[in-house]
Amino acid sequence: MWALCSLLRSAAGRTMSQGRTISQAPARRERPRKDPLRHLRTREKRGPSGCSGGPNTVYLQVVAAGSRDSGAALYVFSEFNRYLFNCGEGIQRLMQEHKLKVARLDNIFLTRMHWSNVGGLSGMILTLKETGLPKCVLSGPPQLEKYLEAIKIFSGPLKGIELAVRPHSAPEYEDETMTVYQIPIHSEQRRGKHQPWQSPERPLSRLSPERSSDSESNENEPHLPHGVSQRRGVRDSSLVVAFICKLHLKRGNFLVLKAKEMGLPVGTAAIAPIIAAVKDGKSITHEGREILAEELCTPPDPGAAFVVVECPDESFIQPICENATFQRYQGKADAPVALVVHMAPESVLVDSRYQQWMERFGPDTQHLVLNENCASVHNLRSHKIQTQLNLIHPDIFPLLTSFPCKKEGPTLSVPMVQGECLLKYQLRPRREWQRDAIITCNPEEFIIEALQLPNFQQSVQEYRRSAQDGPAPAEKRSQYPEIIFLGTGSAIPMKIRNVSATLVNISPDTSLLLDCGEGTFGQLCRHYGDQVDRVLGTLAAVFVSHLHADHHTGLLNILLQRERALASLGKPFHPLLVVAPNQLKAWLQQYHNQCQEVLHHISMIPAKCLQEGAEISSPAVERLISSLLRTCDLEEFQTCLVRHCKHAFGCALVHTSGWKVVYSGDTMPCEALVRMGKDATLLIHEATLEDGLEEEAVEKTHSTTSQAISVGMRMNAEFIMLNHFSQRYAKVPLFSPNFNEKVGVAFDHMKVCFGDFATMPKLIPPLKALFAGDIEEMEERREKRELRQVRAALLSRELAGGLEDGEPQQKRAHTEEPQAKKVRAQ
C-alpha cells in the first residue's frame, strides 16, 4: 500500500509540476468516440422505409398513467422504431428504471404545449445527445420549435444531435413501422372556460413582464444568448394535436414445411423468387401445377391503426366529435382502429357527447384512459429502498405514499381500460392486453429481502441500543426547521436518486425550496400523498442556485401546481418569491412568450442582490427582500458566488431564533462559502464524487466527499449533510475515514431535524450493512482505477527516465485550484 501511495503521489507531482502538462501523464484516459448506434447501422442495411414490409412486433406501453405526480406518457415499440407520446417531468426517470431504452428513441410526439406534456423534454434531449443519437424528430404544436430555442438559454448549443421539428400542419410522416397523421384540434370559445389553476391566457395588456415580476429594473434585465429570439410568439392554449397511427402491411410468413411437402426447392437459390412472389400475393406454377399464394403463406396483416388524443376539458369535445378525419376511421372495416388512447379528465369521459364519439369506433376498438383517476405505482425502486431504510429509523426515513385516485372511473358502453404503469397493448402479432410487466409494490418482500442480508439486523439492533441515551423521539420530531431531502442525485434523474431539491420546513405553515430539479413535484406527492396541496400552500420561496437543468427544471410544475393547490385550499393566489440568477428570468420569459403563461406566478429576486455588500438600486427588489425575510421569519438571507459554472450561487439562511442553514449548491471547495457559512448550524454541501477523483472533480467543478467535509470543518459547522451524489453512487456513496460524528449522508425522502444530528453518524453501520453489495462493487471499481493509475505512473516514470528514490513530491491540496487548469469561479 505504501508503494501504491508513493507511485500515485509521484504521478500527481509530475502532472501538476510547472513545465509539464497533464497530458504527459496519462492517468485519465479519454473516452473513446462513440460509434454510430447499432440500430442505425441495422436500419441502413434494411434500406428505405417499407422495403422489408412492416414489423413483426408492435405494442404500446404505458410509461406514466396520468396520475398527478407522473402525468401521462405512452411508449410505442417495434423492432424497427421507438416512439414516445408526451414527455412530462419524470418520464426519463421512469424509462431508465423500467429499461425502456432512451437511446432508441428517434420520434417524440407532443399533444399540446403545456408543461405537463413537455416538462421532461429538455432533460430527455440532453440525454439523447449524450447517448450519441444523431437525430430525433419532434412532432406537435407550432410553439415546439420556439420551446427548443428557449431551452438553449440553460442547455447551451445542442451540438451533436439534430432536432427536426415536424409542425402539425406538415403532411403525414412515414417510416418503417407506420404512417402518422397529425390532427390539429382547436377548442370552442376557449377563453373564459377554465379552472382557476389552469393558468388561462390573460390579455397581454394585463400581464406585461414588468407587472408579472416587479423585481427587476432595466439594468437587471437578462440578456438572451445568441440565436434566441426576443420576439413575443403566439401562445395558443386552444390547440391540441391528436395522432392517428396506421401500421404498415405485414406480409404473410412463408410456410417452409408446407413448401417441402409440395416439392418446392427449399434450401436452394431457386426458392428465393418463389418466396418473393407468394409474399406479394401472386400464385406460382411448379411442375405444371398452379399454387396459390395463400397455400404457402400465412394471411397478411393489413395493419391496424391506433389513435392518441388529448381532450383537456369540455371545450374540446365538440371539435373532436365533428372532426372529419376521425369520422373516416370510425366504424370502417377497411381501416380498423384497434385502440384509442384518451388523455382526458373524468369531466370529459362522463360527457354524453364524448361517450357517443367513443362508441362510433365500434365494439372491436379498445379504449385506454390516462388521467388522474389512474392509481398506479410508478417509481418502484424508490418505494423499495425507502421501505428498507425505514427499518433503520422510521422517523428519519418515513414510508412513501402513493397519490390516491379520486374515485372509480365512469361506466362506459365501450371496452375501456384504465392505465397502469407498464401496461401493454399488443398490436402485432395479435391484438391483446398484456399485464405481465405491470409492477406491484409489495413492502413485505422488500422487508424480508433486507432482513436476510448478513449483519443487517444485528447492526440495526446495535444502533438502537446506542441511541437509547439520546433524546426521546417525540422531543426530536417536534423541532423546526425540518429538512426534507427530495432529490439528492446529480445530473439526471435516476431510479433511486432524483435530482436536486431540498424542502426546508421553517415552521408548520412556512417552507422554502433549495433548488428545484425535474420531478420535484412528483417527489412531494410521493412524500406527502394527499397532503401535498397543504405543503404547497406553505411554500413561501424557492432558491435556484444556478441554471443547470438538474437544479431548476422542476420549478414550472411547482408554480402551476401551487396555483391549483391554493385554489383547492380556498387561499388567495399570490406570486411565489424566487431567488435565482437573473438568467432564470430569460428562460421563464421565453417560455411565457412562446408557450404558456407563467410570469404571473413569480416575484423574482436576483441572487446577486443578496450578496454581502451588494447595492440594491431598485425599490421593488428591496420590498421583495423585506417580504422574503418577514414571511420566512429570517434575520438574513445571504448569497455568494461559488466555484461552478457562471452565475452559480450558494446561500445562507439565518433565522430570527438564531439557527443558520447553509446550502452550497454545486461548487468546488469555495472560500466565499466558508466565510458566509461561518458557525452554521447545518451545512448542506454537494459531494458529487468520491475521494481519489479530485482531478475529475476539478474538471467538472464539483467536490469530493472529503473536500465537502473539510469545508464544513473550516466553517465550524455544527453538522454537515453530504448531498448531490453522482449517479454512479446510486444507493450510497463510498465512506471515507474523514466521516466523523458531524457528518451525515442524504437520501431521497430523508427527514432531518437539528435534534437528529447525534443520530446521523450512528446510522452509518446499518447503512453499510444494507448496501454491502453495492459498497463492495464500488470498492472494486476504485481498486481497478487505482491499479490503472499505478500503471500510468510506472509508464510516466519510465518515459521520464526514472526518478531518484525518495525524491520529495509535494501533494497539491485539492481545495486549491490547480495552476494547470484555469477554472472560472463566478
Curated annotation (Swiss-Prot):
Residues 16-51, 188-231, 798-826 are annotated as: Disordered. The modification Phosphoserine is found at residues 199, 208, 212, 229, 618, 736. One of its GO terms (cellular component) is mitochondrial nucleoid. Residues 27-38, 208-224, 808-820 have a biased composition (Basic and acidic residues). It comes from the Eukaryota. It catalyses: Endonucleolytic cleavage of RNA, removing extra 3' nucleotides from tRNA precursor, generating 3' termini of tRNAs. A 3'-hydroxy group is left at the tRNA terminus and a 5'-phosphoryl group is left at the trailer molecule. One of its GO terms (biological process) is mitochondrial tRNA 3'-end processing. Its cofactor is Zn(2+). Keywords: Endonuclease, Hydrolase, Metal-binding, Mitochondrion, Mitochondrion nucleoid, Nuclease, Nucleus, Phosphoprotein, Transit peptide, tRNA processing, Zinc. GO terms for molecular function: 3'-tRNA processing endoribonuclease activity; metal ion binding. Residues 1-16 form a transit peptide. The keyword Phosphoprotein applies. It is found in: Mitochondrion; Mitochondrion matrix, Mitochondrion nucleoid; Nucleus. Zinc phosphodiesterase, which displays mitochondrial tRNA 3'-processing endonuclease activity. Involved in tRNA maturation, by removing a 3'-trailer from precursor tRNA. Associates with mitochondrial DNA complexes at the nucleoids to initiate RNA processing and ribosome assembly. Belongs to the RNase Z family. Homodimer. Interacts with PTCD1. This is Zinc phosphodiesterase ELAC protein 2. It comes from Pan troglodytes (Chimpanzee). The gene is ELAC2.
